[in-house]
Amino acid sequence: MSGDYYETLGVDRNASKEDIKRAYRRLARKYHPDINKEAGAEDRFKEINRAYEVLSEPETRARYDQFGEAGVSGAGAAGFDYGDMGGFADIFETIFSGFGGGVGTGSTRRRTGPTRGDDLRLDLKLDFREAIFGGEKEIRIPHLETCQVCNGSGAKPGTGSRTCSTCNGAGQVRRATRTPFGSFAQVSTCPDCNGAGQVIEQKCDACGGAGRKQETKKLKITIPAGVDNGTRLRVGKEGDAGTRGGTPGDLYVYLFVEPDKEFTREGMNIHSEITISYLQAILGCKLQINTVDGPQELVIPAGTQPNTELMLEDHGVPKLGNSAIRGDHLINVKIAIPTRINNEERELLEKLAHIKGQSHGKGGLEGFLGSLFHK
């Protein structure tokens, strides 16, 4: 599936809800499995439905715009309800309603209007705790900004522009080609004015007539709690500036989390290990252990077995988008068996072995302690 739901529907990120609905209906009728029997049409139909499911609802669309797929991964993508499209008959009505008139009646003699700026990508590294708790980060981004000298016109202050003589201000040129099948007209962007319809008399010295300049900007962005490797954040209108009055593009920040020496992460749960003595395992105890929230008390039950996993509830990773919900901290318990003991310890252990009816002559101390752990 396409990595971007907007691309799946073929719409701009600023598209209205009606634009999204129209694009969805157009593509859905094209790839509907009862209409399109080509291989892959059904899979394409499911992709289109999933994209519409996310983008048609303001809440899920907002989460997707900010976090990408991670923000909507919980939304149900299984199955498809044909009723979402207003009924199968409605699809056919839409299909055949477009064949009543001519094709290509719109005018092609129009200059290129405002153009949206390009989107930009920035990769940002976070340490383990920054990803869990979020916070503010300062970043520097090189991008194109509107030239402040000419206000984006590209013309030297005090001068202007004239109508392009090549396209007569249309921004496009038409070329007729004759073939054995008739004449065909090919329309392309004017090479002299690049579709603007106007030619600058004297270019701005600051930007060289481009209307934009490369600048490096400092930004403070908010990292939400619970982000993970690959989480994508959208910072609106911080991409490249548009041209001819177009809106700026967006900045997409992709997050990469540095590993931690003590903790690992699995979804919303945090994992760590502790090592205790065989006596602590047999008798039980209370210990202070490190968590992402600081030191916490952990109860080791008497008779704890090697590789037992103990849990501290609500000390894991906050849920992305709802930090009131947290995962757990899971602690794997390792038990240290001593390789050397003093005479007093040996005497006590031999007494214990006698009480338990265990022979300590075979298998050594470790074998004896192992039998204790698995009684």
Curated annotation (Swiss-Prot):
Under the heading InterPro entries, the entry gives: DnaJ (IPR012724), DnaJ_C (IPR002939), DnaJ_domain (IPR001623), HSP40/DnaJ_pept-bd (IPR008971), HSP_DnaJ_Cys-rich_dom (IPR001305), HSP_DnaJ_Cys-rich_dom_sf (IPR036410), J_dom_sf (IPR036869)
Which SUPFAM superfamilies does this chain map to?
A: Chaperone J-domain, DnaJ/Hsp40 cysteine-rich domain, HSP40/DnaJ peptide-binding domain
- Cofactor, free-text remark: Binds 2 Zn(2+) ions per monomer.
Where the record annotates domain J, the positions are: 4-68
Required co-factor(s) are: Zn(2+)
Family the UniProt entry places it in: Belongs to the DnaJ family.
Q: What is known of its domains?
A: The J domain is necessary and sufficient to stimulate DnaK ATPase activity. Zinc center 1 plays an important role in the autonomous, DnaK-independent chaperone activity of DnaJ. Zinc center 2 is essential for interaction with DnaK and for DnaJ activity.
Per its record, how is this protein called by name? Answer: Chaperone protein DnaJ
Originating species = Rippkaea orientalis (strain PCC 8801 / RF-1)
Lineage of the species this protein comes from: Bacteria, Bacillati, Cyanobacteriota, Cyanophyceae, Oscillatoriophycideae
Q: Which gene is the coding source of this polypeptide chain?
A: dnaJ
